[in-house]
Structure formats: C-alpha cells, structure tokens
Design a protein with these regions (language model features):
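N-terminal/domain-start alpha-helical segments
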Residues: 1-122
Length: 124
C-alpha cells in the first residue's frame, strides 16, 4: 500500500467509478467527486496528493476548479478530457494542470502518468 491520496473529479459515473477501482487496486486512497465544486470541498477537508479532473462538468467545470485550487494548493493535477485539440491542451496546462490525458484512455496510461507526477511531487 502507498500513502498517496488521489482525488478523481468526473461527472461520468462509469468513468469515475472505473478510475476509482483501478487506483484503489494499485494501493491509492481515492476520493471521488462529480463536479468541481464538490472536488474543492474534498480538497479543503482531506489531504490530497494528486487530482485527476475532467474539464467539462456541470455546476463547476474543471478549468474553474483548477484555477481556484491553485490559489492555495500546489499538488499535481492531471486533466482528463474528450477535448483533444492542441489549444485545449495548452489552455489546460497554462491554467495550472501538470498533465493532460485525452479520452478514450487506457488505465495503464493513466496510472503511469499518476505515478510519474507523484514521483516528481514527492521530491519537493
């Protein structure tokens, strides 16, 4: 078991649950939210080491959520989105994400990116 806490913010319940199960099976503690507002609430209540955030969600989108969380937090953020245009990726990275994964994705790719970001983060 590792000690990392990962927040997954995704409005598609099937994707949310799938990522949650996969990360739990890899030893991560997983917190889940269906929109950015709920994600920010979890961040204020729990120690989070990395967030995987969908961009297009109801209530509060991922871009707004990451802009708000960057006001007080510096843990790694991976955007997860069906938006695959280069401009979308550049925007996501410029507002504070550390990585950008496009849907569809494989669980192995997402896990590799999570591990990579946490490895970098743990050095600081």
């Amino acid at each position: 078991m590792n000690e990392y806490h990962v927040l997954v913010v995704e409005d598609d319940k099937e994707i949310l649950d799938g990522i949650g199960i996969y990360l739990k099976n890899q030893g991560y503690t997983v917190y889940k939210a269906g929109n950015g507002k709920d994600g920010l609430s979890i961040i204020e209540q729990e120690e989070i080491h990395l967030a995987i955030v969908d961009i297009m969600m109801p209530v509060m989108d991922g871009i707004t959520m990451v802009m708000k969380l960057r006001e007080n937090h510096d843990f790694p953020v991976i955007f997860l989105s069906a938006k695959s245009e280069e401009l979308d990726k550049i925007t996501g990275l410029n507002i504070g994400a550390d990585d950008y994964v496009t849907k569809p994705f494989t669980p192995m790719e997402l896990l590799a990116r999570v591990n990579s970001q946490l490895r970098r983060y743990s050095k600081y």
